[in-house]
Amino acid sequence: MLTGSSGKAFILSILQASPSARDSRSYLSSFAPPQPVDIATATPAATPSDGAQPPAQNPLVNALLNPILRRPALVKIQGPFTDAQLESICRGMAHLQKLGLVSVIVVDRDDLPSTESSDRYEAQRQRAIVRHEVERVVHFLSRHRAAARPVFSTVARIADPELEPEEAQKGVFVEEEGLDHVRRAVGEGEIPVLLPVALDSGCRSRRIPANRVLLALASAMSTHTSSPVDLTPRRLLVINREGGIPSYARQGLPHLYINLASEFSYINRTFQPQWNDSHPTALSNLFLANGCLAHMPREASALIVSHRSPAALIANLITNKPAHSASLPHALLVESEGRITRDTPTLIRKGLPVRVLRSMEEVDQDKLTHLLETSFKRTLDREGFYNRLKNDLDFVIVIGDYAGAAVCTLEGKPVSDSFAYPPNHPEPICYLDKFAVHPSHQGDGTVDFLWVALRDETYGLGQLDASNPSIGSLRGVGRGRDLVWRSRSDNPVNKWYYERSSGFLKTRDEKWKVFWCDAEQRLGEIWREREFGGGRLVRVVEKEEKGRVKWWEEVIGAIPSAWSA
């Protein structure tokens, strides 16, 4: 029973997560118990009733408040924290436990050297500090009625290359005996709180970096899955004082969403020297996420979050999404209410590589056809569609092995020597012909990664944050172009398009909506010109933009359908 201020705060934190229908299905698939069908009672005969029937129960609400399945998460509490700060963190851990996520916590103190001192007395002092941290965490968890278990035994071992050659590459590993401490706690719904220690080859317990213990746990918990308790971790949570991973493109504000397969090396290369002072553990936590997620399921994620953002923990569990969609307009992210701050968390996924293909010879037509037909549930007119692309292709962005794709064409090109572009429009239209994500990848971040790559190649080109590491991309070099596309008026995806477009209009027959994203570089130049020329605001339609929407509608309206009748 949830009562008092703590219970109200718990319910409020769930409501603030605002899960979508897809988020709800994802949460239910992981944490709700399977619903057995009783044949004898599956279709009861209708019987008269004198009283009102009780309202139907909501399965998401039931699963959130009464979870049956318990899933583990790896958590690093990276202190030092004051009592008030640590209590706030433990309150979040207690809420996660109520929702079915049992935290396997490793305490850390980034004010201590990462490895144990060679001086015996100093080493003992450091060990006493981290042991006290374990006791503090257990105390505050218990205060919030979260069953917790301090684990002072050593669960990890430092591999001896001569005696354990198979484990030597890992450096630190967890054996079945050590894993039993975690298994028993998770099986009983308790939160194990571990020391960052390991046994060396001489059976001496030594303090080691917490990251090495977490990496060893991620490997062992994902490998030893034969027991009744499934220990495969669903989340990695790093709670620190720094906040998320700083972004070069956002001038030091955090990354919202990181696609490790595409961005890992790039983030390391663009990490600025001054961030070593403001975010001294950012890169080590990025390496930690990369290593742990390599062992975890595809849908798993890592969250790097400040202790000042406790609500992000529950939002991440329920939605498995970043605090803000990374594909939203940059101005909306940095200027609107609820904008990005230093404390905004960074969500990290394994992700998929991103490629930009600029010729039909690079495109796998069979795989693209399968993606489009599966996503749209329609049959592609292959001959007509690919013949048109041979003449009009601008580029194709491909995520992974065609898990998603964006096809852009150049429309309104000269058809004869006498052809003349409309005034103020001296180039073809950059038209988003197809945008598709395979159903198996919907909800796992692929759509955001795809849209961000599309933005960087079109309307965001020329901006600092368009410098991305995608294979074949323009790396931010060039001049941005307006991006235009159309969608059926009754398409449920239009709500998503409204949030990302600069504007839209209905066609005369009202069957379509034409959307567009204005080139950010051009808008920035207009804004600066107005700012230094008297402060006049940018008009809804600037002089150089007059007539463009009418031209777009005419040209796009003439594009034939890509689908078979």
Swiss-Prot record:
Entry keyword Cytoplasm: no
Cell compartment(s), UniProt: Mitochondrion
Reaction it catalyzes: L-glutamate + acetyl-CoA = N-acetyl-L-glutamate + CoA + H(+)
CDD domains linked: DUF619-NAGS-FABP
Pfam (any one): NAT
Superkingdom of this protein's organism: Eukaryota
E.C. designation(s): 2.3.1.1
Pathway: Amino-acid biosynthesis; L-arginine biosynthesis; N(2)-acetyl-L-ornithine from L-glutamate: step 1/4
PROSITE patterns: GNAT_NAGS
Gene Ontology process terms (BP): L-arginine biosynthetic process; ornithine biosynthetic process
Keyword field contains Cell inner membrane: no
Record-level GO cellular component terms: mitochondrial matrix
Annotated spans, Disordered: 38-58
Domain N-acetyltransferase: start-end pairs: 352-540
Family matches, as InterPro entries: AceGlu_kinase-like_sf, Acyl_CoA_acyltransferase, GNAT_dom, Vertebrate-like_GNAT_dom
Major localization class: mitochondrion
Gene Ontology molecular functions: L-glutamate N-acetyltransferase activity
SUPFAM superfamilies: Acyl-CoA N-acyltransferases (Nat)
Keywords: Acyltransferase, Amino-acid biosynthesis, Mitochondrion, Transferase, Transit peptide
Biological role: N-acetylglutamate synthase involved in arginine biosynthesis.
PANTHER family linked to this entry: AMINO-ACID ACETYLTRANSFERASE, MITOCHONDRIAL, N-ACETYLGLUTAMATE SYNTHASE
Protein family according to the UniProt entry: Belongs to the acetyltransferase family.
Protein name: Amino-acid acetyltransferase, mitochondrial
Organism: Cryptococcus neoformans var. neoformans serotype D (strain B-3501A)
